[in-house]
Every structure is written in structure tokens, then in C-alpha cells.
Amino acid sequence: MISLLRRTLFCAVAGAALVFADTPRVVPAIVDSIPHEQTHFTQGLFFDGKDLIESTGQYGESGIYRRTMDGKILDSLRLAERYFGEGSVAVGDDIFYLTWKSHKAFIVNRKPFSMKGVFRIPTEGWGLTYWRDALLMSNGSHELLQIGLGGFAVVGVIPVTDGGKPVKQLNELEVVRDTLYANLWMTDLIAVVELPSGRVLKYLDFSAKVAELRKRNPGMDVLNGIAFDGKDFWITGKNWPQIYKVRF
């Protein structure tokens, strides 16, 4: 109960601090849902054709999963117990899968899953996506690191700001053309960010929906997970019972 209270208070304070008065808030409509494995501590979510790829976290429980829309697991790969998995993204024949504090990212064969390699990342790994020929990684700060695929060096940094002030706790990421969608850790918000400027255009506010869900599922954790199927967005969270199609 104390943990839940602290999390609730933190979310309220963080949400208030992050959203500036002149920045629009939009409440998306929930238009559909599909089942989600509630034991999955969601860290990354994206579509690969008609399949959903999900990467999960927690020590001893981290892995990557290929699943159908009705929840059938088609493929999976688990990390060693010493790794805490984070965000992921597919590029070409590979899936790149971050770890939290190990300063490592794994290269996984896209289909079928198998471990291909590993490379070093300079900070904690949080969220991961792909934009303009480079990986785009969040690390809990307000800066997005651009990581080149040829050698995996940092080739650029994009600060994310709202009203000229840094927006921190950037977590799971999804890019559609030149717009970034970023979960803000410990809030019920998704920041919609213009690239390459890093300017927040608006926030998607899921606070009412999350409050409703928590009444029925007190064990669920924070909003985290954004996937775009080419037409619609799907969102979920850590240990959530459903993945939701949303429109805004």
C-alpha cells in the first residue's frame, strides 16, 4: 500500500511538473483492446508485419516475444538472469534489445529469434526506436542518443524540451515519420515530440483510463509501450491485462 501511495503521489507531482500551461493535452479515445500477458513487465513494443514484438524487463524475467494479436506466442528468447531488459526495435534482419544498467545492447536475429551479438551503450538503456538511419535511445534523461549502426557510436544527441525546459524520464519510444511518441516514466502521459528539434508538441493524457484500470487491477504498473500498426496506435503498460488501440 505504501508503495502504491508513493507511486500515485509521484505520478501526480511528476505529471504536474512536466506539463506546461501552454502545451496541449489530448485525451485519446480507446477504440479496441486485445489481451496482454499480465506477467510481462513491458519495456518495448512494436509491430513486425501483423505480429507484435514485445521486450520485457526484471532480473531473471527479461525476454523478447513475438505474438499474434490474439495473444498466441510464436517465438521467444530469454536473457540471462543478470540482465534487466529494456526497449527494443527491429532494423533489417536484426532486433536491437537494450539492457538497463549493464551498458549492453543485444543483437537478436529477427526471425526466428537467436542471439547474434552484443555492443556497448554509454549510459543506461531505457527506450529504443529507429530514425534517419540511426538508433534513437532514451536513458531516463531529457536527451535522446543517436547511435550509428556502423560501429554503434553516438553520432548525435537530441534534447527534448517543453517551453525551453528539459523533459526528463523519457522511456519507451515510437517514431512515425518525423514525430516521436515517448512514454514519460511514472506518469500517465505520452509526449508527442517534433524531430529533429526535440520540441514537445502536445501530451497524450491517459490518466483517467489508467485510474479506471487500477481500480480493477491494483497490481498493474505504469503506462509503457507504444506501437504503430501503420494506421493506429496501440498502447499498454507494465503488467497490464490489455493492449489498447487508441485514436487521437
Predicted regions and their residues:
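A short helix->beta-strand "capping" segment at the edge of beta-propeller domains
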Residues: 22-39, 69-72
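Surface-exposed loop and turn segments in beta-propeller and other repeat-based domains
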Residues: 32-34, 74, 78-81, 157-166, ...
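Short loop/turn segments that connect beta-strands within beta-propeller blades
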Residues: 67-72, 109-113, 149-152, 194-198, ...
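Beta-strand-rich domains and repeat architectures in extracellular enzymes and scaffolds
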Residues: 31-63, 77-89, 237-241
